[in-house]
Amino acid sequence: MNDEARQPGECGCGCTDGSSAKGIDRRQVIRIAAAGAAVALAPLGALAAEERPQAGDLFVADDVEKDPVAIKAAEVQPGKPMLAFPFDPASKKIRNESRLNKVILVKLADSDLDASSKERAASGILAFSAICTHQACEAKTWVSADKSLVCFCHASKFAVLDAGRVVAGPAPRALPMLPLKLQGDQLMVAAPFTTPPGGAG
């Protein structure tokens, strides 16, 4: 078949005759617009999950992945620290896409807290980053004898009663604290982390 005998669309280049061009253009525009909207909106949920805790966030147990139920202050018992992630109560988005958002909730007697700690506590509960400041392992082992948190990787030890100060091991700085307040009987984030969470490098 010579070129003159070929019908529109038969040349293999994807061209069409003029009668159908407008219809195809409209469909392409619709598909492109829909794809663009999906791309634009998709990161919003991911961003919310990666964002650091925000004032007004509530907390959910760290093993919950959807349909979060807010942790109540009464659920955090003395000597039994609880791992948690913050979540946005409006969108129900759990901020668990970054492990740097994981916190450990520790219940103490009011008489154990100094003035500075009381300002960041709610019902005797303090929140610390659960991520060691050395190499970003989890500092979650509770030592009741001296009320400290220990990282299982390199034995860095943090004093809960002294704003997470390093008392042993290679960690270069204190555990960040996350100030709390109460909303009814639920624990709520009062302010951002006191310092950025994460390891030294």
Language-model region placement:
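Short Fe-S-cluster ligation motifs
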Residues: 158-199
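Acidic, glycine-rich flexible loop segments
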Residues: 133-140, 144-156, 161-174
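N-terminal twin-arginine translocation
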Residues: 23-28, 39-57
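N-terminal pre-ligand scaffold of iron-sulfur
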Residues: 49-131, 136-141, 182-201
